[in-house]
Amino acid sequence: MVNRLKEKYDNEIVPSLMEKFNYTSIMQAPKVDKIVINMGVGDAVSNAKRLDEAVDELTLIAGQKPVITKAKKSIAGFRLREGMAIGAKVTLRGQRMYEFLDKLVSVSLPRVRDFHGVSKRAFDGRGNYTLGIREQLIFPEIDFDDVNKVRGMDIVIVTTANTDEESRELLTQLGMPFAK
């Protein structure tokens, strides 16, 4: 079964982008390549159970088991040793990526308190968009009663676009609610 957002991309967004940016081939049209969700768990240094909770929550949110990230350097001020587990990340591609993006845009972001749209300035100059979320409770899979600690996460949407303008147009047409 083809995802609703993937179908919209193929049938409506690609022709629209080709017309707007004067592409000669449909392969020039930018597309979402992958979505990386990263959750840093700073208190995993003192309490290893916190990391397991974060992994479980990220598994529920992404529908895929995350990879545990380890510290690259030792930092004495944070009581951190090189190689200690300090977070979790998951990379979504294909069907799961479109399902997550659809859920993020249509269900999760509207549940954010005092939400007026996401920043237009969070592009990196190469067509990738980074979004910070302050609490994992905006996702429908997370049960409020089971959460011990509110954690944020970073969501990076990697596109094949060459410029920020192309990427912004792609994400706008996919339904990303940018601030006015």
From Swiss-Prot:
Keyword Electron transport: no
Alphabetical UniProt keywords: Ribonucleoprotein, Ribosomal protein, RNA-binding, rRNA-binding, tRNA-binding
Protein's UniProt keywords contain Ligase: no
Gene3D superfamilies according to UniProt: 3.30.1440.10
PROSITE patterns: RIBOSOMAL_L5
GO CC entries: ribonucleoprotein complex; ribosome
Entries under SUPFAM superfamilies matching the protein: RL5-like
InterPro entries: Ribosomal_uL5, Ribosomal_uL5_bac-type, Ribosomal_uL5_C, Ribosomal_uL5_CS, Ribosomal_uL5_dom_sf, Ribosomal_uL5_N
Gene Ontology molecular functions: rRNA binding; structural constituent of ribosome; tRNA binding
GO BP terms, alphabetized: translation
Complex formation: Part of the 50S ribosomal subunit; part of the 5S rRNA/L5/L18/L25 subcomplex. Contacts the 5S rRNA and the P site tRNA. Forms a bridge to the 30S subunit in the 70S ribosome.
Matches recorded under HAMAP family: Ribosomal_uL5_B
Protein family membership: Belongs to the universal ribosomal protein uL5 family.
Record function comment: This is one of the proteins that bind and probably mediate the attachment of the 5S RNA into the large ribosomal subunit, where it forms part of the central protuberance. In the 70S ribosome it contacts protein S13 of the 30S subunit (bridge B1b), connecting the 2 subunits; this bridge is implicated in subunit movement. Contacts the P site tRNA; the 5S rRNA and some of its associated proteins might help stabilize positioning of ribosome-bound tRNAs.
Name of this protein: Large ribosomal subunit protein uL5
